[in-house]
Amino acid sequence: VTNFYNMLRKKLWNASPNEGHRLIQSLEQQYEVTVVTQNVDNLHECAGSTHVIHLHGELSKVCSSRDPYNPEYIETLTPEHSDVEPGTLAKDGSLLRPFIVFFEESVPMIAPAAHEVTSTDLLVVIGTSLNVYPAAGLLQYCRPGVPIYLIDPNPVNTNAFQHVKQLQMGASEGMKRLTELLNPASSKETKD
């Protein structure tokens, strides 16, 4: 497991945010934005997003096997120092492990994410079939009447939710369209 995550981190350091990540970040200039992501790649932060909740952890970090969410035992790795030797111990004496939510583990950040959704005025959901739980269940925390935009190239069954507008396109194209919908005056100016 350790060597597998060492290999993934090597790929991570060469990854760059796409236009969708940058457009999400650009919304922070006009709105209070919280990003809730299932991805572990930190590309939202690389694009400049400042408030990100990582549901499934972060590939660039390692933690204690005994107490994985204790900040005292979470370490951030760098491209220069990202390989972890198998058997390396955390500060509490347990094995150091990737700061990743493994299959069948609980998702501790789901409660803070649900709290954010309960207070949002607009919910944007990108790149999901709404079949992966518990993240798919976050929509149920949205207050009645709050507009929800779902951006995904594939049709998604949203019958269980009200006020969902689907933008059936990829993340970058969908974020461009959403930006136009949120700022119709500025998108008209750029077209003129």
Residue ranges and their predicted role:
Residues 1-192:
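Conserved catalytic alpha/beta core of Sir2/sirtuin-type deacylases, generalized to analogous enzyme cores
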